[in-house]
Amino acid sequence: MFLLTLKDRKDDGAYAVQNRHGDKVLFLFEEEDDAVRYALQLEEQEDTEMEVVEVDGELAIKTCKLYNYKYAVITPNDIVIPPKLNDNFSKN
């Protein structure tokens, strides 16, 4: 699996998105191509360089569960795009 970090700042942790409830969700991509595509969209939108990092999927999921982090496994059949900056989600 693959996740995203800020380029040259892996120690700052993985990139996560905020869901409509305000919780951060870590995206774990099954395919590197999908992670790269998402990273390019982020770079264009946020003017920040991202890096795609390969991780052991089972270990990443176990770690998320251990620390009660939310995560989503992004399969090749999923379509995800970065949320626009300052997007407001309906609380309903």
Kindly give the residue locations of the regions a language model identified:
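Conserved NAD+-utilizing ADP-ribose enzyme module
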Residues: M1-N92
